[in-house]
Amino acid sequence: IYANAEKYPIIYAKYAEEGNFPKIEDSFYNYRKNISFNNASLMYYPPYSQYIRNYLYNETYALGHSPMRNQYSSKFTVDLLNTIQSKIDIESSKNAFLRQTVISHFYNKSSCDINEEAFSTFLKLSTNEKDKKLIQNLVDDSKAIRINNNLPNFNVTNYNNSKHSISKIIKDRNAFLFFWSPEFVSESYIVSRINFLSNNYPNIQFIPVKIDGDKNNRIQKLDIKNQFYLDNDSDAYKFLTSKMPRSILINKKGKVINGFASISSYNLNNYLKQLNETK
C-alpha cells in the first residue's frame, strides 16, 4: 500500500491530461513517520525494497523535476543518485540502489549517447569496486562504437562451428545485432522479444550473438541460421568488456545508427522504425 502511495503522484501525472503532478497535502505522507528507511533485514524483501525505490523517486521529483514519461534526464538521474546517497545509510543497500539506477536509466535511454555526469556521479558515490569496474567498462563499451561510422569487423561462430565475418553476414541488410549473456537475460525473454520485433519490423535481420556462458547451447526456439556466438579471441570483445547485453543497429550501407540500444526499452522503437524503412 505504501509503495503505491509513493508512486501515486507519478502515476497520476502519467495519465493526467495536463501531465502535471497532483497537489498533495503534507499529511498524505504521515505514514513515513512509522517507516524505517534503513532496515537491513528487510532490504532484500521485494515489497520493502520496492517501497524504498518509489520513495527515492518521489523525493527526487519533489526537488522540482517535471514528470518524465519515456526517459529520465541526466539532471534527474544525478539528483536521484544523490538522494540515494543522502537517504540510505546501509552501505551494501546504497551501492545496490546506485548500481541499479545508473544501469536502468542508461538502458532505458537506449542510446550510445551517454549521460557523462550521471556516470561520474555514480563512480564518485559508490564504494563497491566491482560495481565501479562494471560501470566503467559499460561507459568504455558505449564509446567504442559510434553512430554514422562503419561497424568494426569481427568474427562470429555459427552452431556448425564455422567462423564468419560479421560484415559478410549483414552485407546489404538492415541488421539488429543482439549481444547477450545468460547471466543477464533469459532465453525465453529473447525468444519472445525477437519474435515480436521480427513480426513488426520485417525488413530487419535480427541476429542474437551469445557472448558468455555455454557456447554449445543455442536458443532452441529461434532459427539456428541467425544465431551465433563469440569465440574467446573475437575482436568483438573490445566493445563488450562489461559482458552486459547490447544491441547494435546497422543499416544496409554498414553504418551504425545506434551503437548501444536496449532490446527491452520503449525508446528502441523509433530506431527500429527508422531502420525498417531504410531502402
Describe each PLM feature range.
Residues I1-Y159:
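Oxidative protein folding and maturation machinery
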Residues Y107-S110, P182-S186, G213, I263-S264:
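Short acidic, S/G/P-rich loop/turn micro-motifs used as interaction or catalytic elements
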Residues Y159, F178, Y201, M244-P245, ...:
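Exposed, low-structure sequence patches enriched in small/polar residues
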Residues H164-I194:
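Short active-site neighborhood of thiol/selenol oxidoreductases, capturing the structured segment around
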Residues K171-N174, P202-Q205, I224-K225, K252:
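Loop/turn elements at helix/coil->beta-strand transitions in domains of secreted/extracellular proteins
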Residues E183-D223, N232-D235:
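Structural microenvironment flanking redox-active thiols in thiol-disulfide oxidoreductases
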Residues I219-K253:
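Short, internal strand/loop/helix patches
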Residues K252-K279:
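Thiol-/selenol-based redox modules, centered on thioredoxin-like
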